[in-house]
Amino acid sequence: AGSRGIANVNVITRAIVDYVKEKGAYPFIVPAMGSHGGAKAESQKELLAGYGITEEAMGCPIRSSMETVLLGYSEYGKPVYQDKNAHEADGIIVSCRIKPHNAFRGPYESGVCKMMVVGLGKQKGAESVHSDGLGNMARNLPANAKVVVENSNILFAIPCVENAYDETALIEAIPTEKIF
């Protein structure tokens, strides 16, 4: 779960949790927000609570930590990280919003790739992908995301798209092999 004001994020997140439970699994939520909340685990959990995402409301644990695992290096030599709790899970479902980025343009801006690289990469992931400046984000973001897909258990992504009124307009699951 991320830190940006996504419409209905608590309803969407709870629906994903319920779906996973219906399949017989034991879900947990990981704050996927890079360095937001001052890059502090408890502050990230508090940000989620502000969106109505609490353990009580979601019916599952929230495992908040800034600890990461190094997954490998991109083709451009960038280290790629992943939240340790997410990495140790049997599978990861990436929930996010797809929208244009406000500071760069490219084939992948704000969405699944950014959530995998920056959100689940925590502060280290954010620093790595931003280290060459915004001018190289359109190159680094998908390159780092490919390392995530190749070296972790991303089951699928379930992004939403909002309309011009910031209302949920579309939610569609994307199989991992169709992220790129």
Which positions does each model-derived feature cover?
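An acidic, phosphate/nucleotide-engaging active-site surface
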Residues: 43-107
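N-terminal active-site beta-alpha-beta segment that forms phosphate/nucleotide-binding
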Residues: 1-45
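Conserved, well-structured core segments that form the ligand-binding/active-site neighborhood
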Residues: 82-180
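Flexible loop/turn segments at secondary-structure boundaries
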Residues: 6-8, 36-38, 70-71, 101-102, ...
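Core alpha/beta catalytic barrel or barrel-like domain that forms the active/cofactor pocket
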Residues: 28-36, 58-68, 157-163
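Alpha-helix capping and helix-loop boundary segments enriched in small/acidic/polar residues
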Residues: 4-7, 80, 135
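A glycine- and small-aliphatic-rich helix-loop capping segment at beta-alpha/alpha-beta transitions
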Residues: 11-20, 43-54, 108-118
